């Protein structure tokens, strides 16, 4: 089994303020570690469920938030941005058996998450699931 994990930061446990996800602010390092631990737990769960390959995309801001030292050895981490049209799920394709989204937030205006926002449509016009 091959698993793709895309990780954002605004939905990580305990995040309630933009300063907690801004690498220039003092609270950031605490939530950077929390994000890394949550992604590591997802990787370990995927491996325990039979994944032979786990690919992680750091999909928050600069793409350089996840601390690799927390990830299982067989995990491949994509850092930074390549300009790929799939953006937060770059390199996702039909060879993957599962997609996990860790630390994601709700859409703008939906409530329930103080950092809810929506992806820009500057590069993506439409995303369709289960069509």
Name what the model sees in each region.
Residues 6-7, 57-58, 99-104:
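Short beta-strand segments
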Residues 26, 30-57:
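Alpha/propeptide regions of enzymes that mature by internal proteolysis
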Residues 21-32, 73-79, 120-130:
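Glycine-rich tight-turn/loop motif centered on a GG-T
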Residues 1-2, 49-52, 73, 94-98:
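Short coil/turn connectors at secondary-structure junctions
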Residues 3-20, 31, 35, 49:
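N-terminal glycine-rich anion-binding loops that anchor highly charged ligand groups
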Residues 61, 65-74:
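Glycine-rich loop at the start of a catalytic domain that most often binds anionic cofactors/ligands
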């Amino acid at each position: 089994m091959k698993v793709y994990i895309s990780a954002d930061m605004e939905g990580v446990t305990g995040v309630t303020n933009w300063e907690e996800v801004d690498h220039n602010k003092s609270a950031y390092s605490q939530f950077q570690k929390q994000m890394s631990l949550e992604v590591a737990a997802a990787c370990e769960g995927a491996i325990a469920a039979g994944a032979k390959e786990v690919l992680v995309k750091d999909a928050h801001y600069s793409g350089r938030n996840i601390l690799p030292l927390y990830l299982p050895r067989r995990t491949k981490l994509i850092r930074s941005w390549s300009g790929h049209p799939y953006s937060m799920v770059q390199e996702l394709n039909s060879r993957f058996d599962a997609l996990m989204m860790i630390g994601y937030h709700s859409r703008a205006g939906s409530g329930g998450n103080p950092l809810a926002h929506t992806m820009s449509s500057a590069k993506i016009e439409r995303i369709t699931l289960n069509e």
